[in-house]
C-alpha cells in the first residue's frame, strides 16, 4: 500500500483539500453536514488520484529520460502500466461515486475535470502555456466544493473568484517548480516558461501571476467576506505569496511547504465569514 501512496503523492492532497473546502464553506450559509464533508473528501481524493496517475502514465517515457524523475515508480520498474491503470480505475470509482452521492448536478459536471487531467500532460509537448493546465486542473477544486453546496450556477461570482485565485496561484507555483527542469526541457524539446524565456524571466511571470492571485483574493474578500476577523488571514496569504517568490530558489520550501500553508490560510479566511 505504501508503494501506491508514494506513487500518487497522497501528501500533495494538502494543496487541493483546503481549497475544495474553501469552496464548500464559501457557498454554505450554515455549517455543512458531516455527510457532505465526507463525500467531498472522497471526491477530492479520487480526483487527485486520477490526476496524478494519468500524469505519471502519460509522462512515463519523459520521466525515464529525466535524471530528476527517472526513479519514479513507472520508469524505475517498480510499477507496471497495468497496475497504474488499476489505480486510475479505483480513483474513478471513488470520484464518480462521491460526485453522484453529493448531487446529480455534480455528477453531470464531474467529467469536466477529467478532460483537463488528460489534456494537460500533453500540453507541454506543444506550448509553454501548459503551466495554466496545472492551474486550471487545481482551480476545479474550490469550484467543485461550491457546486457541492449550491448544486447550481446561481450566484456563482464568489465561487468563480476563489477558482480564479487558485488558477493564478497554482500556475505561478508550477512555473517555480518547472525551473528545476529548464535544462532538460530544452534538450527534450518540451515547452515551459523557463525553457522558453529562461528561469529569471519565468520567475518574473510567476510573480505577476501571484500579484494577480492576491488581487483576486482581495476582491473576493470585499465582495463576499468583508469581515474584520478575516483580514489578518488575507494579509497573511499575501505575505506567504511574497515569501514563495522570495524563496523561489529553494523549490522544496516554496513549492511544498509554503504552498501547503497558503491553502489553509485561505480556508481560514473564508471560515471567518
Locations of the language-model features?
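Extended hydrophobic alpha-helices typical of membrane-associated regions
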Residues: 212-215, 219-273
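Helix-coil boundary and interhelical linker segments in multi-pass alpha-helical membrane proteins
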Residues: 22-42, 94-108, 143-164, 216-229, ...
Amino acid at each position: 500500500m505504501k508503494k501506491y501512496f508514494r506513487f500518487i503523492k497522497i501528501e500533495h492532497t494538502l494543496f487541493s483539500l483546503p481549497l475544495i473546502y474553501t469552496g464548500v464553506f464559501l457557498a454554505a450559509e450554515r455549517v455543512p453536514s458531516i455527510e457532505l464533508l465526507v463525500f467531498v473528501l472522497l471526491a477530492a481524493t479520487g480526483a487527485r488520484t486520477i490526476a496524478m496517475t494519468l500524469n505519471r502514465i502519460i509522462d512515463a517515457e519523459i520521466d525515464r529520460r529525466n535524471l530528476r524523475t527517472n526513479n519514479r515508480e513507472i520508469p524505475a520498474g517498480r510499477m507496471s502500466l497495468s497496475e497504474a491503470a488499476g489505480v486510475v480505475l479505483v480513483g474513478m470509482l471513488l470520484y464518480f461515486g462521491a460526485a453522484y452521492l453529493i448531487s446529480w448536478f455534480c455528477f453531470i459536471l464531474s467529467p469536466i475535470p477529467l478532460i483537463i487531467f488528460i489534456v494537460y500532460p500533453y500540453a507541454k509537448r506543444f506550448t509553454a502555456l501548459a503551466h495554466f493546465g496545472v492551474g486550471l486542473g487545481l482551480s476545479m477544486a474550490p469550484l467543485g466544493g461550491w457546486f457541492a453546496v449550491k448544486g447550481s450556477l446561481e450566484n456563482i461570482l464568489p465561487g468563480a473568484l476563489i477558482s480564479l485565485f487558485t488558477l493564478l496561484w497554482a500556475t505561478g507555483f508550477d512555473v517555480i517548480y518547472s525551473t528545476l527542469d529548464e535544462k532538460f526541457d530544452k534538450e527534450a524539446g518540451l515547452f515551459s516558461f523557463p525553457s522558453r524565456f529562461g528561469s529569471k524571466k519565468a520567475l518574473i511571470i510567476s510573480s505577476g501571476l501571484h500579484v494577480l492571485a492576491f488581487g483576486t483574493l482581495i476582491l473576493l474578500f470585499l465582495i463576499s467576506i468583508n469581515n474584520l476577523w478575516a483580514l489578518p488571514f488575507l494579509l497573511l496569504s499575501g505575505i506567504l505569496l511574497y515569501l514563495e517568490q522570495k524563496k523561489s530558489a529553494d523549490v522544496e520550501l516554496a513549492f511544498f511547504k509554503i504552498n501547503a500553508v497558503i491553502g489553509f490560510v485561505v480556508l481560514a479566511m473564508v471560515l471567518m465569514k
